[in-house]
A protein has these predicted regions:
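Non-catalytic accessory segments of DNA primases and related replication-initiation nucleases
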Residues: 1-108, 130-150, 220, 230-231, ...
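TOPRIM fold recognition
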Residues: 3, 13, 116, 176-179, ...
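Intrinsically disordered, low-complexity segments enriched in small/polar residues
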Residues: 9, 30, 35-36, 84, ...
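Surface-exposed flexible segments
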Residues: 14-25, 121-128, 194-195, 240
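Intrinsic-disorder-associated interaction segments
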Residues: 58, 70, 150-155, 263, ...
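Short, exposed beta-strand "edge-strand" segments with a Pro/Gly-rich flavor and a Y/T-containing core
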Residues: 82-83, 152-169, 258-268, 272
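Phosphate-handling DNA/RNA-contact segment within nucleic-acid enzymes
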Residues: 110-219
Length: 311
């Protein structure tokens, strides 16, 4: 209230009396403060609550994935897999799941986590033994993350399923497949080879990305869980959470029913059972190891291993 800033041009004067007449609520507030000994203050409009913002998710450059998908000759897990299922099949799997090779530990495996929208959420680097295919845990556990190795400041990692990018495939073959979820990335790859009628995903650990937010990508899908031995009860407790999103959910107890006490104590998973019987590729690899000339013979005549189970 008071004189207009442009009084010299308009001559208008808005008096305090007129202001309080037009704004009785302000007058009442000031009078109340004076009655209780308060100092009159100018009325302020109520503060607006700021909308809650979700923490920003960091992504890795997609070209890092492409750059890593080479030098498989030094990748111990790749070399192990070629003995299990053959080079051609491994090449297809590593391309489908976008598995890479790192310079760390002489060629460690990089399991890239790419979400359904094509964003690269994370890259897990893990060391494997080329002979056994097992993780290297001695003299230290060979596991790291790409963003840590690259020293990316303020990187906010939010994991997704390993293999989640396959859910964006709208082809009739992939989109109609039931989704099978296991714990480890290596298990997902092995199962994808032997049981291709499922789309195999991995949580990346007992808990990993197994949470309410991450499972939203499974909306409307038929999902079956294949937990490691000893984790069946814990994973079965996740069913109500999945049932609120998925069209149908099941937690397989197949391994629990067929496992021995020793196997159960070892916490084996479905991949361990799939590899219990030697594949033709594994038998051939042992034959070549005993007689390297056999590989030269195969290469010279372009021989291929025929699956006896195929007609």
């Amino acid at each position: 209230a008071g004189m207009c800033d442009h009084i010299n041009s308009c001559g208008y004067h808005y008096t305090p009396k007129e202001y309080f007449r037009d704004n009785p609520a302000v007058k009442e507030r000031l009078n109340g403060q004076e009655r209780f000994g308060g100092t009159p203050i100018a009325a302020r409009p109520p503060a607006r609550a700021l909308p809650e913002q979700k923490p920003r998710i960091s992504f890795l450059p997609s070209d890092w994935v492409e750059q890593s998908m080479r030098r498989y000759d030094i990748n111990p897990l790749y070399r192990y897999f070629t003995k299990v299922m053959g080079k051609e099949n491994v090449d297809k799997l590593f391309s489908l799941y976008r598995v890479g090779t790192s310079k760390m530990w002489g060629g460690a495996t990089v399991f890239w986590q790419t979400d359904r929208d094509g964003n690269v959420r994370a890259g897990k680097i893990m060391g494997y033994d080329a002979e056994s295919g097992h993780r290297v845990k001695e003299p230290f556990n060979q596991v790291n993350w790409v963003h840590s190795v690259r020293k990316m400041p303020d990187f906010r990692m939010k994991q997704c399923f390993f293999g989640e990018h396959l859910l964006s495939d709208t082809s009739s073959t992939i989109s109609s497949n039931p989704v099978a979820i296991v714990e480890s990335e290596k298990t997902a790859l092995i199962a994808a080879h032997f049981i291709p009628d499922f789309t195999w995903l991995a949580t990346g650990g007992t808990h990993g990305c197994f949470n309410r937010e991450a499972i939203q990508v499974l909306e409307g899908r038929e999902v079956i869980l294949f937990p490691d031995l000893k984790a069946t009860d814990e994973w079965r407790q996740r069913l109500p959470m999945l049932e609120s999103v998925c069209r149908r959910t099941t937690c397989s107890d197949l391994l629990e029913r067929i496992a021995t006490d020793e196997q159960r104590s070892q916490g084996l998973d479905i991949a361990d059972f799939l590899l219990m019987e030697d594949t033709p590729q594994m038998i051939l690899a042992r034959m070549i190891e005993c007689n390297p000339v056999l590989q030269t013979f195969i290469d010279t005549f372009g021989l291929e291993l025929v699956d006896a189970g195929q007609e």
